[in-house]
């Protein structure tokens, strides 16, 4: 027998009237529901037993047949079949309508499908359906065309004139007739022909119409089925009616809606039978149409039908929509049995794989197992009495409970479950009380703390489920964070504090001899006798050598695995995590778990022994604070007076003040930490808590003992009045008031941002849920290049970290020997990465999900390593969901962390100079330099300084026996020459040899430092610069415009009162001339400098402050105007989350920058079209035409007449638009940009996410292409199509000898891409449910159930992990029902950390 769950795909389509009749078991003729006296369903009513089946099992309505033996008999008296009452959930009825009505989904949705087919607008359709206008069906010789609307008078006029030949109609009848007359095939052919004739068609409506026509043609649906003659009635159990106490009834809204339809339908039938006047009948028909509309989709109507208490009734569509709808409430998330929840408390005595389960809960959760066991042991004769025993809580029940619970894993979950580590499995240990006990080290993964958090517990029942739980979900298998491969189980808080105290060292008195010991036992004895302290320096004979260490460190080293290098340093939380990662790398998870439990024990033990506490005295305020604050006040005063004299603007003064306070705050913090460090011999508890990473950050301690510093307003602006006090001294009233801003913003943000982050995660999951690892190798030749990430000069992410866990895409070759070190497709482990780094590579090509060519999902080689286990990913791994969780989870975390600092603002100290931290040689200075009055070299346009790191330099005569030649690459430590005295000279770093003019140099990488206009250069080409020597100086607060020649100023299109505003500063009475936007007039503001016959023009952007008057004389290098840069706002993820959001949604930024479409030379024409300046780019290739570029007048242009630009360069200021990058620079550039930008936001917050997760999502955003030329394919121009389908179709057409289609890639944001998935189930359960289903039904779409969501919805196993196709045929055999047996466990011994297996044996 075929089970109803055994199918591969689901198709959705329009139902024909015959189909609806086929489903139905009878017609519902009366609006009655149940008889108020007998409470039995009324015959022919909405709950009729004859139609829908009996309400009592195996019993007919009248009671003639009353037992299972009459199964299938239909009662001759009442006509009810004797069957199960369950059939009332599946049997449908129908209502025969007296007049056809239109289905609201097809005429009211945008775009209206019916409207597209008939080429009518929604309003026209409505006026026909609602009996306002006639529509022409057959125009005869009237000269009108089919489908035109006419009013009553015209209709009668035409009738009189042309008689029966002229046919027009009104209402749904007419629409149905028109739809039935459409020849879908012919229409579609005609439109295709039209499109080809017109070429490059742009009318979207025609394309849309073609799409709908072809949908009907290909799906076998008939257009007239969109008009209903017969309405299905859903089974009564799905719209139940229940009796409340007090004899009243609660009913589903659908019953009310159905009743209205039946009432109106019956009334219409009567009126037609009575041959009532047309006007009355029409009104009734209109009301029937409205009733059916309300039944199908009440929320779409302007005035929804209201029920009791003025509440809109819930129609069939509303049942599906939204968070409370069928999809999201019941299909994607169900409540499950065998679960419980309780408060959690810490269980420091537990092992890493255990949890404490309260006996009360265990009794309920394991009830069936206990009952079965009681019967097996003959402690109860049958299940029923066993149940009684359990409920009475007899003594033997608890003995059995121990046995049943043993080795039966349970799952713990803490909401919100933001990533897969929010559910983990543990082995239960029974405990007294009512609270669940949780191991302290798994808290971080759950983001749990013990301030009243609750957790839910779930029991896996079947042997298969238990096995999976045990093998995959047990906490020891989840030590690493899937987002980045770092341990997530690191110790925190008291454990860290204990370990830090244990491994720290007391300062020893100078010259005092060290006590010596020969082994660990002696040291223990000495501690017990009080001869030495845990932190005293001693010397000890250990592992064959004499060490200088402390007893505490010796004790700590006993818990590390054998053979691990001796750890001889104080361990903060970061250090401990490093050791955990290292042990995992070298010894695997089993040893790591054992070590974790030992670390936990040690940490708690010694935190208790050393018992640090903090008192107010421990918060030491630095004595230097008063002086520093005094200096700052003087500097602020100075800035104020400069402003009053008019030397600087108010904005500059403000920035200066903020900078002064930021700097002062940093200085105070520094001196405070020095003070704390000296206090109590380096063991000040406040300092230790911060230093060890146990609690508190530098930020927080700075506020306790330094100064609170600058605060931000809710808008993110910084208040320039700094808070000079700290919490130890106490705040003044004003300071307290300023502080409240930040504190409140913190709380408000947390509430709002958590929802945003949750929604981001939901969209990410939705777009990437069907990315599953599907094959071993897709065989692509494509790859991406990954390299070091730098910020200025600092390496933020090393090459090793960047390429870890990827497969190489090319052979890695040793640059010295030219041998292949690692062939293509080598998995890059830490070791491999280190070696590649040592070879001097700063970037290599690796495989990536972005370039993977798998049909479904991605392949192992392109994805690389599974970050949660550091082994290659396996087929069936749901990498898409993991990627989504890895990106979404920190979003939520970070927003929840804003408020801990209490809104203290941090502004960057503005740099005024360019410098590098090493000795360098200036290779080149790009850009136009002019010499000003002070004879300084000034950049008059944007440019750059190219500097190369100088590693070593010798005169050639100082060297003998050169081993290298000019241009050769050298490695660190490579021998390059010997000196005359015979000493070896080796390279200090990887670099390249450079020999010229008798000088031998080893040079490192080049750095290009971009500089802005007005920068003063202090160096010349070929200068050798010292570390941190200022290379160039600039104004950090303003962008400037600089004159390139001496001459006289002439204002052009600058008029005071029109586009120049005179701002008088009230406090200083200085006058500022500021350029403002002028909408009405076509002004192109610029300043010209005229000298003899030559003139130079400079465009002046909006917001510029003009520094010269009309007619002034200026010298080359003088400033003509300044543009103040926007005040720095504080950046936290509050700014960050919206940024991630707009990147993933691919939104166009407000003021997008313009990119150069081609390489070429700029010509600024000076013409203005529609408030935009016009520029031309003359391409390098003379055959190409010049490219016109328009830029809004207000924007600052980055280029000048005669500049050369490269394709993709920014021409004006503004933010990059991802769509432009894709269009101009191509897919690769866009991918790199998106990954980098998203990483940037998270990196600012100190969150590590592996690139591959972001790549998986970006891959999904670039799935579609836009057809630009359809060739001989079945595509239409401007159609969006899946890239894979596009390639397949092209292959087919080429094979048949046709011309292939051409397309451009398009970028879709998360929401758009999710709604465009192949699976309509997935899209419908995401957003816009009715729209998706309408569309799918017309197209007759088939859902092949490839993704995870679709399968969850219909209750299949998901096609990932053990549900993958290739595992479908494997079955698990069990010798006994209940728990896992010994033999199974032995087979899997490898997978289960030894500690667990040992433990479980030892407890019996």
From Swiss-Prot:
The keyword Zinc applies. Keywords: DNA-directed RNA polymerase, Magnesium, Metal-binding, Nucleotidyltransferase, Transcription, Transferase, Zinc. Its cofactor is Mg(2+); Zn(2+). The keyword Phosphoprotein does not apply. GO terms for molecular function: DNA binding; DNA-directed RNA polymerase activity; magnesium ion binding; zinc ion binding. One of its GO terms (biological process) is DNA-templated transcription. Residues 1381-1404 are annotated as: Disordered. PANTHER family: DNA-DIRECTED RNA POLYMERASE, DNA-DIRECTED RNA POLYMERASE SUBUNIT BETA. The RNAP catalytic core consists of 2 alpha, 1 beta, 1 beta' and 1 omega subunit. When a sigma factor is associated with the core the holoenzyme is formed, which can initiate transcription. NCBIfam families: rpoC_TIGR. DNA-dependent RNA polymerase catalyzes the transcription of DNA into RNA using the four ribonucleoside triphosphates as substrates. This is DNA-directed RNA polymerase subunit beta'. It comes from Leptospira borgpetersenii serovar Hardjo-bovis (strain JB197). The gene is rpoC.
């Amino acid at each position: 027998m075929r089970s109803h769950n055994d199918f591969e795909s689901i198709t959705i389509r329009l139902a024909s009237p015959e189909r609806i009749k086929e489903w139905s078991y009878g017609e519902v003729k009366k609006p009655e529901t149940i008889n108020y006296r007998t409470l039995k369903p009324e015959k022919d009513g909405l709950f009729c037993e004859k139609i829908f089946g009996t309400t009592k099992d195996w019993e007919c309505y009248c009671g003639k047949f009353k037992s299972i033996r009459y199964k299938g008999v239909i009662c001759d008296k009442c006509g009810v079949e004797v069957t199960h009452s369950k059939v009332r959930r599946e049997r449908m009825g129908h209502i025969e309508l007296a007049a056809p009505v239109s289905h609201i989904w097809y005429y009211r949705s945008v775009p209206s499908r019916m409207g597209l087919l008939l080429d009518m607008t929604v309003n026209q359709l409505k006026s026909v359906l609602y009996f306002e206008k006639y529509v022409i069906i057959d125009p005869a010789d009237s000269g009108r065309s089919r489908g035109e609307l006419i009013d009553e008078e015209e209709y009668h006029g035409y009738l009189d004139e042309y008689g029966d030949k002229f046919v027009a109609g009104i209402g749904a009848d007419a629409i149905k007739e028109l739809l039935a007359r459409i020849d879908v095939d012919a229409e579609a052919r005609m439109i295709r022909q039209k499109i080809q004739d017109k070429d490059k068609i742009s009318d979207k409506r025609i394309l849309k119409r073609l799409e709908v026509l072809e949908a009907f043609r290909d799906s076998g649906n008939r257009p007239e089925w969109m008009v209903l003659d017969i309405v299905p009635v859903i089974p009564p159990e799905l719209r139940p009616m229940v009796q409340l106490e007090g004899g009243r009834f609660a009913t589903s809204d659908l019953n009310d809606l159905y009743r209205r339809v039946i009432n109106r339908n019956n009334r219409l039938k009567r009126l037609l039978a009575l041959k009532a006047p047309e006007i009355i009948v029409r009104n009734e028909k209109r009301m029937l149409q409205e009733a059916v509309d309300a039944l199908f989709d009440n929320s779409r109507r302007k005035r929804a039908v209201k029920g009791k208490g003025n509440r809109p009734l819930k129609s069939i569509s509303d049942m599906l929509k939204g968070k409370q709808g069928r999809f999201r409430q019941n299909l994607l998330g169900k409540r499950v049995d065998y679960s419980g929840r309780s408060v959690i408390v810490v269980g420091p005595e537990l092992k890493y794989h255990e949890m404490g389960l309260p006996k009360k809960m265990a009794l309920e959760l394991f009830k069936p197992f206990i009952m079965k066991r009681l019967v097996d042991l003959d402690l109860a004769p049958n299940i029923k009495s066993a149940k009684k025993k359990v409920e009475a809580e007899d003594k033997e029940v608890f003995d059995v409970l121990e046995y049943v619970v043993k080795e039966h894993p349970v799952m713990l979950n803490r909401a919100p479950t933001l990533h897969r580590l929010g559910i983990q499995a543990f082995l239960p240990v029974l405990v007294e009380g009512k609270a669940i006990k949780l191991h302290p080290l798994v808290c971080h993964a759950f983001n749990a703390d013990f301030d009243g958090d609750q957790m839910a517990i779930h029991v896996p029942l079947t042997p298969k489920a238990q096995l999976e739980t045990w093998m995959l979900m047990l906490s020891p298998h989840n030590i690493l964070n899937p987002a980045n491969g770092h341990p997530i189980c690191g110790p925190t808080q008291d454990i860290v504090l204990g370990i830090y105290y244990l491994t720290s060292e007391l300062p020893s008195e100078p010259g005092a001899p060290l006590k010596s010991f020969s082994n660990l036992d002696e040291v223990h004895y000495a501690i017990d006798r009080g001869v030495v302290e845990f932190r005293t320096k001693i010397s000890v004979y250990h592992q064959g050598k004499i060490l200088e260490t402390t007893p505490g460190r010796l004790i700590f080293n006993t818990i590390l695995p054998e053979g691990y290098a001796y750890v001889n340093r104080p361990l903060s939380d970061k250090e401990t995590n490093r050791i955990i990662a290292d042990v995992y790398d070298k010894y695997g998870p089993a040893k790591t778990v054992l070590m974790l439990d030992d670390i936990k024990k040690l940490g708690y033990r010694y935190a208790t022994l050393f018992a640090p506490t903090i008192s107010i005295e421990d918060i030491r305020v630095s004595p230097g604070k008063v002086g520093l604050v005094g200096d700052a006040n003087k500097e602020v005063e100075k800035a104020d007076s400069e402003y009053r004299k008019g030397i600087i603007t108010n904005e500059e003064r403000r920035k200066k003040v903020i900078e002064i306070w930021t700097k002062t705050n940093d200085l105070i913090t520094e001196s405070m930490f020095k003070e704390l460090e000296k206090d109590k011999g380096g063991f000040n508890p406040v300092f230790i808590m911060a230093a060890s990473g146990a609690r508190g950050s530098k930020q927080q301690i700075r506020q306790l003992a330094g100064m609170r510093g600058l605060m931000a307003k809710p808008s993110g602006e910084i208040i320039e009045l700094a808070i000079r006090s700290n919490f130890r001294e106490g705040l003044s009233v004003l300071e307290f008031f300023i502080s409240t801003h930040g504190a409140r913003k913190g709380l408000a943000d947390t509430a709002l941002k958590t929802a945003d982050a949750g929604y981001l995660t939901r969209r990410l999951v939705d777009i990437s849920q069907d990315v599953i690892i599907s094959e071993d190798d897709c065989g692509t030749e494509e790859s991406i290049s990954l390299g070091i990430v730098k910020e200025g000069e600092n390496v933020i992410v090393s090459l090793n970290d960047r390429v870890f866990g990827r497969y190489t895409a090319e052979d890695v070759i040793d640059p010295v020997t030219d041998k292949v070190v690692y062939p293509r497709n080598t998995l890059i482990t830490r070791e491999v990465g280190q070696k590649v780094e040592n070879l001097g590579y700063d970037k290599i090509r690796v495989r990536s999900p972005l370039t993977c060519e798998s049909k479904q999902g991605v392949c192992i080689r392109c994805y690389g390593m599974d970050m949660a286990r550091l082994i290659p990913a396996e087929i069936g791994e749901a990498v898409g969901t993991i990627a989504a969780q890895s990106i979404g989870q920190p979003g939520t975390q970070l927003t929840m962390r804003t408020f801990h600092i209490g809104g203290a603002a941090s502004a960057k100290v503005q740099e005024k100079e360019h410098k590098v931290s090493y000795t360098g040689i200036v290779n080149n200075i790009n850009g136009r330099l002019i010499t000003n009055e002070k004879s300084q070299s000034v950049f008059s346009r944007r440019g750059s300084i190219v500097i190369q790191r100088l590693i070593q330099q010798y005169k050639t005569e100082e060297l003998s026996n050169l081993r290298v030649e000019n241009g050769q690459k050298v490695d660190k430590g490579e021998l390059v020459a010997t000196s005359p005295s015979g000493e070896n000279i080796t390279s200090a770093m990887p670099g390249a040899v450079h020999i010229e003019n008798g000088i031998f140099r080893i040079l490192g990488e080049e750095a290009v430092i971009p500089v802005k206009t007005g920068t003063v250069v202090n160096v010349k080409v070929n200068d050798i610069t010292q570390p941190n020597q200022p290379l160039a100086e600039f104004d950090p607060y303003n962008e400037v415009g600089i004159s390139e020649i001496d001459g006289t100023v002439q204002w052009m299109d600058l008029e005071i009162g029109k586009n120049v505003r005179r701002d008088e500063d009230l406090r200083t009475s200085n006058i500022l001339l500021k350029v403002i936007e002028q909408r009405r007039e076509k002004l192109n503001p610029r300043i010209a400098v005229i000298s003899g016959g030559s003139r130079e023009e400079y465009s002046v952007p909006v917001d510029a402050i003009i520094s010269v008057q009309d007619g002034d004389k200026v010298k080359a290098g003088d400033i003509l105007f300044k543009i103040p840069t926007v005040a720095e706002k504080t950046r936290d993820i509050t700014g960050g989350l919206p940024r991630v959001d707009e990147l993933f949604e691919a939104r166009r930024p407000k003021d997008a920058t313009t990119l150069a479409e081609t390489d070429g030379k700029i010509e600024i024409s000076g013409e203005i079209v529609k408030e935009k300046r016009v520029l031309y780019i003359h391409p390098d290739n003379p055959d190409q035409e010049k490219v016109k570029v328009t830029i809004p007048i207000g924007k600052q242009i980055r280029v000048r007449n005669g500049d050369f630009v490269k394709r993709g360069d920014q021409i004006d200021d503004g933010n990059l638009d991802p769509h432009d990058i894709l269009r101009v620079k191509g897919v690769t550039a866009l991918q790199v940009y998106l990954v980098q930008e998203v990483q940037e936001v998270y990196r600012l917050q100190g969150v590590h996410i592996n690139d591959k997760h972001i790549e998986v999502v970006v891959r999904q955003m670039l799935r579609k292409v836009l057809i630009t030329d359809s060739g001989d394919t079945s595509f239409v121009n401007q159609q969006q199509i899946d890239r894979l389908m596009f390639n397949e179709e092209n292959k087919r057409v080429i094979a048949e000898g046709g011309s292939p289609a051409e397309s451009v890639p398009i970028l879709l944001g998360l929401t758009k891409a999710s709604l465009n998935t192949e699976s309509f189930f997935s899209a419908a359960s995401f957003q816009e449910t009715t729209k998706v289903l309408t569309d799918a039904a017309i197209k007759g779409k088939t859902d092949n159930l490839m993704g995870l969501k679709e399968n969850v919805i219909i209750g299949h196993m998901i096609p990932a992990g053990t549900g993958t196709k290739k595992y479908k045929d494997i079955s698990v055999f069990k010798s006994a029902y209940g728990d896992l047996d010994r033999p199974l466990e032995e087979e899997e011994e490898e997978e289960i950390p030894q500690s667990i297996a040992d433990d479980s044996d030892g407890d019996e």
